A protein has these predicted regions:
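N-terminal intrinsically disordered/low-complexity leader segments
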Residues: 1-66, 133
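Hydrophobic/aromatic-rich alpha-helical bundle segments in the mid-to-C-terminal region
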Residues: 36, 41, 204-251, 260-261
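Helix-turn-helix
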Residues: 70, 74, 78-112, 116
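Short helix-capping/turn signature of helix-turn-helix
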Residues: 84, 107, 173-178, 228
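Residues in the recognition helix of alpha-helical DNA-binding motifs
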Residues: 106, 116-117, 199, 248
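Hydrophobic alpha-helical connector segments
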Residues: 110-112, 116, 127-162, 219
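Short, basic, alpha-helical segments at the C-terminal edge of helix-turn-helix-like DNA-binding modules
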Residues: 120-125
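Amphipathic alpha-helical packing segments from all-alpha helical-bundle domains
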Residues: 152-172, 179-207, 216-220, 247, ...
Length: 261
């Protein structure tokens, strides 16, 4: 069919010659636009759902943490007041206001629960940060001399003794008839030795040991002075205040270990 030209010279295409379907590129563009719109809708829904799930998960985590804390506090009190051997997991669950299966799910066996109780009592919280990697240790090491270092350590030790000495005494009592607790006590004694070693090394950054005293003997001396039994006898049986205990600890180590004291 002949096609006429318009005034500007452009070829005029009759309507019958126009394509009845959009080119493939146009169809693809339209489909892509619809897909993007759908994706936006789905993405918004997914984000909302994920946000909701995250909120629920955070709430559950917080609740689990509070439950764990209640059980630890309940176990600590009962172990100290009633003794380890006579305190049952069921009694701990009742004291914490939770079910026995909940306690067993969170902690496993009674020896495992005692292990956690001691960790929390010594550190002061349930955070999985080693005691000697905490801020107080770095602060103590920043002191200008051995006396300042020992004074800072003694302040932290007295608080740890307040929290943990009673539980340790209950564990000592149970260890004689319970192999699991005996192993736990051995581990605690080793940890105390590591802390004593750290204290001696802290002293050596500022001063020398007394003549005739080697590092191993110095560590043993500090290890003994840190004994929770000693703390208990001085504060409970002899009526010492916590400040008197802390001052005695720091001064005793300085006099027994540091040259020139």
């Amino acid at each position: 069919m002949a096609r006429s030209r318009g005034p500007s010279g452009c070829v005029l295409i009759p309507p019958s010659d126009l394509p009845q379907e959009l080119p493939a590129a146009s169809v693809a563009a339209a489909s892509y636009g619809r897909a993007i719109a759908n994706m936006s809708s789905v993405s918004a829904d997914s984000l909302a759902e994920r946000s909701k799930r995250g909120y629920v998960s955070a709430a559950r985590t917080d609740q689990a943490s509070k439950t764990r804390s209640r059980v630890i506090h309940a176990a600590t009190r009962l172990f100290v007041e009633q003794g380890y051997a006579t305190t049952t997991m069921r009694a701990i669950a009742g004291e914490a206001g939770v079910s026995l299966p909940t306690v067993e799910l969170l902690f496993g066996t009674k020896p495992q629960l005692l292990h956690v109780v001691l960790d929390v009592a010594i550190a002061g919280d349930d955070d999985p940060v080693p005691v000697l990697s905490r801020a107080w240790a770095a602060e103590a090491q920043s002191k200008d001399d051995a006396v300042g270092f020992l004074s800072a350590v003694a302040q932290v030790l007295k608080e740890a003794q307040v929290r943990s000495a009673g539980v340790m005494l209950a564990a000592y009592e149970a260890a004689a008839s319970d192999p699991d607790i005996d192993l736990l006590i051995a581990d605690r004694e080793l940890q105390r030795q590591r802390t004593a070693s750290w204290i001696v090394d802290g002293i050596l950054k500022h001063a020398s040991l007394r003549a005739g005293l080697d590092r191993a003997a110095a560590v043993d001396t500090v290890w003994m002075l840190m004994d929770p039994v000693v703390f208990s006898r001085l504060t409970r049986h002899r009526g010492w205040s916590l400040e008197r205990y802390a001052a005695w600890f720091a001064d005793s180590i300085a006099q027994l270990l540091v040259a020139g004291r």
